[in-house]
Amino acid sequence: VPKKEKPVIHPVSEKSVPEKEKSVIHPVSKVSKAPEIAQINPSPYAFGDLPDNRLLPVRGHSRMNYTVKWAKKTKKHIDIASMAGILRLTPMTPEVIRVSFVKGVTTEIKDTYWKPEATDVFSWSVRESKTALKVSTEKVSAVIDKKTGAIQFETADGTVLLKERSVEPRLIMDQQTWEFFEWDSSEKINAKGILSTDLLVLRAKAKYISFGGKPMRMPLVLSRKGYGLGIAAKETVLLCNIKTYGPYISTLGEDQIDYYFIYGETNEETISMYKKLTL
């Protein structure tokens, strides 16, 4: 009886498999991130709201000592200590200086919702005399009086733009802050609304300049002298330009004073620089 031939099994080459039968492995696509939801300012006050006059006087307190005890410069900022707390100046650009203050010498200065430090390299310096510390960029200087701790902002040629009050220039108390400025009596002060053309008049007035109930936006004060103040606060911000009570800029829900001095020379340039402080 003839033996049955064993079936020969040939290995199947990749080429012999029809295209339709090939298993195709598709790369797994990354899960797309949901769009970020803008943080809302929780303040109950809308931009331009009038405050209750009973809230305008600064509450009674023991006067703090802001005399400069020591200063320490790093590559990014300078810390200036007093018995009241730590004042930090952070040059952001040649035209912008961030000013931060916390109560107590052991308290850490925190980042805010906005840009914390410079992202581009540029030259800045600190000069010390018997009476003052001078932090300078190519465009602007901040001069700190050693006796009072108050800051005076100047142009490169020494023209004074803005002064903090010499007696107790700033104050933090029970989650509320006050930053006292000495605006000239003839100086026109405005707060920028949502639109660049929406300017709130603040001469001899007190108004809320934060955007309660709206997506997070930094309040911006504009002066006809060519500078602006960006207030890095996430809740209520009140500007009181009434001499009986201030003048001051106050925040609620904050335990750190934080603002940007912006010297754009014109409102348009100042607003452009302000927009670049958003992360």
Model-derived segments and their meaning:
Residues I86, V96, A150:
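Exposed beta-strand and adjacent loop surfaces of beta-rich binding modules
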Residues I37-A71, K75, T90-L133, P169-D174:
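A low-complexity, Ser/Thr/Gly/Pro-enriched, surface-exposed linker/loop concept
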Residues P2-S29:
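Long, intrinsically disordered low-complexity tandem-repeat segments
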Residues P11, P27, P42, L50-N53, ...:
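Short linear motifs in intrinsically disordered/low-complexity regions
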Residues K4, K20, P35, P42-Y45, ...:
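N-terminal functional modules and adjacent low-complexity/disordered segments of proteins
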Residues A81-S82, S125-L279:
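Catalytic and substrate-binding clefts that recognize carbohydrates or anionic sugar/phosphate headgroups
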Residues H77-L89:
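Mature N-terminal segment immediately following signal peptide/propeptide cleavage
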